[in-house]
Amino acid sequence: MTDGDHQIPNKKKDAFKNFVDDAGIAKYDKAAEGDKYSKYVLTDFGRKICELGGYDSTAWALILCNLAYTPAYNWFINNLQLGVCYSPDSIKDMLGYVMENDIKGLGRRNILSALKIVLSQTPLGKERIFAEFNAEEKKEKITLKSMERCTWENPVPEVILFSLYKFAENCGDYYQ
């Protein structure tokens, strides 16, 4: 994993590295050559995602199956009810109960900012796989107005099977 010409700040590379790791797309390989970023190599799952393509709704639904078991996405899934419209401020307030040490609110802001980007730039929001969102876009700035968790209207059977596999895996390898 490299930005090619070293123009991306390390903070953004760290965030991306964490995302691809959480999503199961790439894993750290200490035997690989290069710096801490280029030591991340594609997993079998990551290769499948690349085959499907970065804008493919099935790819993003599969990624969501992995992300559902990370603390941030798991919180959204368990705390934002389906069909209820939430403002950014209401989500920040809800996050405040689980992020008590986030006195300045920077952590809550960062979580909401990341969610806003994922919803506005991927099929998870654009094709209503995870949520419907209302945002205002001006130049490169996106302002989230509201979001509502929704059900996926046309789920792909392979994604459902993968989600069941992930569920079994996260229940202590209960596959029967």
For the regions a protein language model found, what residue spans apply to each?
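Donor-sugar nucleotide-binding helix/loop cap in glycosyltransferases
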Residues: M1-Q176
